[in-house]
């Protein structure tokens, strides 16, 4: 009976600690890109509105809102594309490492 209990306990425990490091790495990546998703579009919106469109190009306030919003939307898409690229490469790397064992 003890042998069955030990086998059941071993089945419940993870066989290696790569899952924990993988989870931590994934969480760090997610938090990093979350911070980028918040700061980059907002920062680019106000920077391009004030300094580029109104300052350098001399656009009106109404036009600069429009073009700065377009820059912010493009920035969101760039951050999302980078996140997908990093997540794809990280997942395939972990899959290859697990496959070699």
UniProtKB/Swiss-Prot annotation:
Residues 1-25, 87-101 are cytoplasmic. Residues 47-65 are lumenal. Keywords: Cytoplasmic vesicle, Endoplasmic reticulum, Membrane, Transmembrane, Transmembrane helix. Disulfide bonds: none annotated. The keyword Mitochondrion does not apply. Pfam families: VMA21 (PF09446). Signal peptide: none annotated. It is found in: Endoplasmic reticulum membrane; Endoplasmic reticulum-Golgi intermediate compartment membrane; Cytoplasmic vesicle, COPII-coated vesicle membrane. The chain crosses the membrane at residues 26-46, 66-86. It is a multi-pass membrane protein. InterPro entries: Vma21 (IPR019013). GO terms for biological process: vacuolar proton-transporting V-type ATPase complex assembly. GO terms for cellular component: endoplasmic reticulum membrane; endoplasmic reticulum-Golgi intermediate compartment membrane; ER to Golgi transport vesicle membrane. Required for the assembly of the V0 complex of the vacuolar ATPase (V-ATPase) in the endoplasmic reticulum. Associates with the V0 complex of the vacuolar ATPase (V-ATPase). Interacts with ATP6AP2. Belongs to the VMA21 family. This is Vacuolar ATPase assembly integral membrane protein VMA21. It comes from Bos taurus (Bovine).
């Amino acid at each position: 009976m003890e042998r069955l209990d030990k086998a059941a306990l071993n089945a419940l425990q993870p066989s290696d600690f790569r899952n924990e490091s993988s989870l931590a790495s994934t969480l760090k990546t997610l938090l990093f890109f979350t911070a980028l998703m918040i700061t980059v579009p907002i920062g680019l919106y106000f920077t391009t509105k004030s300094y580029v469109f109104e300052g350098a190009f001399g656009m009106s306030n109404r036009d600069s809102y429009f073009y700065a919003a377009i820059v912010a939307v493009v920035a969101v898409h760039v951050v999302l594309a980078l996140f997908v690229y990093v997540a794809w490469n990280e997942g395939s790397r972990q899959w290859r490492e697990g496959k070699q064992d």
